[in-house]
Amino acid sequence: MIPEGTRFLLPPEARLKAEVVGKLQHLFRRHGYEPVELPALELYDPDHPLAERAFKLVDKTGEVLALRSEFTTLLAKLLRAHLGEGAHRFQYAGPLWLREADAELGRLREYTQVGLELLGATGPLADAEVLELAFAALEALGVQGEVEVGLPSLVGEVLKASGLPEALQRRAQQAIHRKNLPELKGLLAESPVPEEARKVLLALPDLYGGREVLKEARGLPLPPKAQEALAQLERTLDLLGRPVLLDLGMARRYEYYSGIFFRAYTPGFGLPLLGGGRYDGALFPKAAGFALGVERLLEALRLPKEEEPPEVLALDLKALRRFARERRTELFHGEDPVAYARRRGIPFLARGEELFRVEEA
């Protein structure tokens, strides 16, 4: 009936999905993030990071198009010529499509993201703002979450200073990210590495925990740029004033993320609910942001099994118009409204301008 990897949502889940998206949009708007609307179709770019997994189409002129596979790159292309100096705040929401999606709640090929971008601002205060909104997003949804913060740029600076050939650097980065110490030791044995760099590289996978991890990292012979990145992270966390889980061996896309990278998890659910970070220079001179996966959030929220009943059962259109402005109201179609209301737990009936309790009917 529908393609594999897509979903048909009935009212309980569709309603909750709309509420989740609406709460996030309202939260971001309150913090100055204005909405933008992006086209679902874009010109196909073979250099796009998700080009191989995008749905491609050909129009009647022969031009190759692609369904939107992520928001940040497209937003950067469209905004680059329109922004002046200073900080700019944007939010987005909508569906994305991937032809070969990663295994996630099955294999979704159509999924929804809500996210934000802070452009034109950098430094600890800007990073703290984005992190604070990640916490606030989870709180707005009533999701108990733990935010994990990494510093891929630190790993990148250590690898650059190691003198390893580029191919070995990439393999070492993957081993550090996976915390595979035996593999990392084997890679370092393939090429001469200064003892100080070797010591730092072997320590990175174990730099995981609370703020005490920063003290451990400061005790290592880090190259100057890595020391600077660590100091920036410490200042960011001081400004944030919230507990986070630090993973200084997190090396995901270190060539893309120029500063922090973070993601959030909730107990009993193994996939990250959100992810983001700072990517100065990748698409904008100064940029940071994050996105939340709505389908993952819905799963983590453990959907209610039963649909929430309306507050009012309207017996005519006049009552529907009158009370739907203030309460959740449903128009009745049938022969016995009292029995129907009692069965569904609807507390009020309405006729015209009159509202009365079911037990009084």
From Swiss-Prot:
InterPro entries: aa-tRNA-synth_II, aa-tRNA-synth_II/BPL/LPL, HisRS-like_core, HisRS/HisZ, HisZ. Pfam families: tRNA-synt_His. One of its GO terms (cellular component) is cytoplasm. SUPFAM superfamilies: Class II aaRS and biotin synthetases (SSF55681). One of its GO terms (biological process) is L-histidine biosynthetic process. Pathway: Amino-acid biosynthesis; L-histidine biosynthesis; L-histidine from 5-phospho-alpha-D-ribose 1-diphosphate: step 1/9. Heteromultimer composed of HisG and HisZ subunits. Belongs to the class-II aminoacyl-tRNA synthetase family. HisZ subfamily. Required for the first step of histidine biosynthesis. May allow the feedback regulation of ATP phosphoribosyltransferase activity by histidine. HAMAP family: HisZ. This is ATP phosphoribosyltransferase regulatory subunit.
